[in-house]
């Protein structure tokens, strides 16, 4: 089992201390929020991202296992206007390009405040939206890991693990997989048996609820 920790768990000034602690404990991965590394326009800093990845690997022995908080600071909604959706598509493709420079194989899609649904037709819109992103992710050697967010996150879209599995199977592309959040399963009182026969859909496992 490979272990990683998210860098939103501590402040930036403690990075070096925590990295060393992780190495001592045998951790091999670091999950990052891009704006924790580059505060402004992180996805425009591809060269810097590549350098960060190299330094982290060569000096600490850590790889970037995952990215979270992909849409931090964005106000657009998937199921808002067409222009909002297009803006989010392009922004997410930039995030995927950024992930490629980091050799990161999982982009956590949570973004609860940007994904509230308003009608039954939104499910089909979601299939098209995430299908396009899944295709782009595969072309860049990475994966969108869709995370169920319970209602306490303030969203009404994909609140439980089974709903996300249904979406992934509907999209049916290798670039969209399940980011399994154990905190969500515990909150929803989901039985682990729902994952029987679905292991091939899981790309990443979380033991904490993201905020």
Which residue ranges define each predicted feature?
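A generic structural signal for short coil/turn motifs at secondary-structure boundaries
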Residues: 40-42, 117-119, 152-155
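N-terminal pre-domain/capping segments
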Residues: 1-104, 131, 138, 169, ...
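Active-site groove signature of glycoside hydrolases
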Residues: 102-118, 145-150
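Short connector loops/turns at beta-strand edges and beta->alpha or beta->beta junctions
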Residues: 70-72, 112, 203
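Conserved strand-turn element in the central/C-terminal portion of the radical SAM core barrel
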Residues: 77-80, 110, 148-149, 182
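Structural detector of well-ordered beta-strand residues that form the stable sheet scaffold
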Residues: 4, 65, 107-108, 145, ...
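Glycine-rich tight-turn/loop motif centered on a GG-T
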Residues: 79-85, 116-123
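Acidic/histidine-rich catalytic cores of soluble enzymes
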Residues: 23, 29-30, 36, 127, ...
């Amino acid at each position: 089992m490979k272990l990683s920790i998210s860098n939103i768990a501590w402040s930036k000034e403690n990075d070096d201390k925590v990295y060393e602690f992780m190495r001592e404990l045998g951790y091999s991965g670091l999950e990052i929020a891009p704006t924790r590394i580059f505060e402004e326009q992180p996805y425009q800093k591809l060269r810097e991202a590549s350098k960060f990845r190299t330094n982290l690997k060569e000096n600490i022995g850590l790889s970037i296992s995952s990215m979270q908080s992909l849409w931090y600071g964005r106000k657009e909604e998937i199921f808002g206007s067409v222009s909002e959706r297009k803006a989010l598509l392009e922004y997410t493709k930039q995030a995927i390009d950024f992930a490629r420079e980091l050799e990161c194989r999982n982009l956590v899609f949570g973004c609860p405040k940007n994904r509230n649904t308003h009608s039954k037709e939104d499910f089909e819109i979601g299939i098209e939206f995430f299908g396009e992103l899944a295709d782009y992710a595969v072309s860049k050697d990475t994966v969108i890991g869709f995370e169920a967010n319970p209602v306490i996150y303030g969203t009404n879209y994909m609140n439980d693990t089974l709903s996300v599995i249904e979406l992934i199977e509907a999209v049916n592309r290798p670039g969209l997989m399940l980011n399994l959040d154990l905190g969500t399963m515990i909150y929803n009182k989901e039985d682990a048996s729902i994952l029987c026969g679905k292991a091939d859909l899981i790309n990443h496992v979380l033991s904490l609820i993201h905020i």
